[in-house]
Structure formats: structure tokens, C-alpha cells
Amino acid sequence: EIRRAAAQGTISLPPPANSEGLEDLAVLKSCLKVIRELSGFRYAFAKDAMAETFAPLMASVEAKNELERQGLKVSLKSYFLSLILKDLENPDILLIDNYINALFNSANEAANGPITVQTVVNVVNSFPQDGINWRENPQTDEEQILLQPDTFPDSKAVQVELARWEKYSKELRDLDPLVHALLTNLYFMAISPLNRHNGRVTQILLQLSLMGQNINSPAPCLMLGRALITNAHFGIEERLYGLRTRQWSPYLQYMLKTLSKAILLSGELLASLQRLYAQTEAYLKMIGLASHAAFLPVIFKHPACRTGEFS
């Protein structure tokens, strides 16, 4: 009944109690944009050709690790390029090469700690031709390194937003690493601290988070939790242009809490799948079929085990 009401736009939530500090209309609208994408994650980045590189990226990381275990040396960047660039005369190669540089130039840093403001600076500097700067900073000329290591936004508001985001990124929480990576990523997209291309930088930051923690894909958690955020999403959307910012910000908080809970539950389900894998492997060994355990990785990588079909 709730889903039907939400689909018809007739669902009604209780009136907001307070604003709890979320007063920035631009931030809230950015959150809503991300929420709409998350509610159908398979198509969230469908308009961005770079999304096609995500799966090959993770595959190349795994392939490189396997080759190194065999004592062979391989350049991860060249391996990745060979996977996604079949035609080296492609006019988009400059953008793709910058995108890959942004990933691999920051990969070592990401592996050694959380994503920080310095990581953002490193990623932005991989696209000097795009004129990316901090939001509300004076516009600078293109074709130059825009953000030096000690650069910080001129705007005090943007400084505060970034400082809070970095603190959240560094906090050790009782969350699955994937959950924390996703929420940190959502937080960055919400504040959108750059004057342009926040979406592209956000995608790269997410990939760095996943690479640093050896996480393969964000899809399972969000697919499993998709239905649980629909109610809150419609509640906010219905009131977006009808209420003052301070009135509907509690709905955003409600949605974010619901999303966090949904992802946490999905993380628990993924953990149970890992336990099932270990139990299955132990059982096969116990009954004398240890050789069959070699097939388990293939079985457990089936989409039914990784997306939303268990929900």
C-alpha cells in the first residue's frame, strides 16, 4: 500500500519538527538528485560514458594482482588502457586518459588511508583543461593546475562543509566498509564543493574508496536497499518546491537515515553470504569433495548472489 501510494504521489509524511542545521537549498537539491539516481542505481550513471570503465577497472586490478602472484610485472594503467581503448585514434582518448590518471595517480594514497580533501585536489588536478575550482572561488584561467596542495576554498561555508566531510571520511564507524564508502560519497555529492564536474569527481572518489578497501562493486547494497528509500524519496520530492528550506530539510534527514539503515541491512546480508561460502567450502572438504570448492567463486559471483534477487 505504501509503495502504491508513493507511486501515485499521494503519500503523506508528518510535518517537520525542525531544520537541524540543513539550510542550504543547493545542498539539499544536490542530495535529492543523488537520491533519485540511487533509487535506480543500475541507470544512475547511464549518461556518462565513463561508467563503462568501472567493471574493466576492477577486473584489471584483479588481473594485475594475479600476474604479480605469478612473478610477472605489468603496468596496471597500460593493462587497463588495453581493455577499454580498442581504437587508439578515438578522439575521446584525452578525456579517458585524464580519467585514468586521476584514478591511478591517487590509488596509492587511497590504499594508505581515507579519502581526504587532498585526494580531491589530486583528482581535480588531473583535469587542468576543465577549469575546475572550489565553489564560490574567483574563476581562474584554464590549462593550469588549479588546486595546489595547500589550496582551500575562499568561501568560509565551503571550508566548513569540506572539513565536516573529511572528518566523516576519517571517522572509524561500526559500519561495513562498503556502507561507509557509499555514505561518504553521497555526502561529497551533497555538498558539491566544486564549481563544476562534481559528479565526475565523485565517481572517481568512490572508485578510489573501493580500490583502497579491495571492494569490487557498490551495486549489491544499493540494489538490496532500493525499495526501502522509495517512501522517503517521494515524501521529499512532493514538498521540494512547496516548503521553505528549513521546513523540508528534516525529510532529507529522514531519507538519509533510512538509506543508511537499508545499506546496513544489505551489508549484513552480504556478510551472511560470505559465511555461507565458508560453510559450503568446509562441507565440501568434509565429504571428500575438496576439488569441487574451486567452482565456488564462479557460483558466488553469479548476479543472483550479488544484486537484488535475494531481497
What role is predicted for each listed range?
Residues E1-S311:
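FIC/Doc superfamily catalytic core
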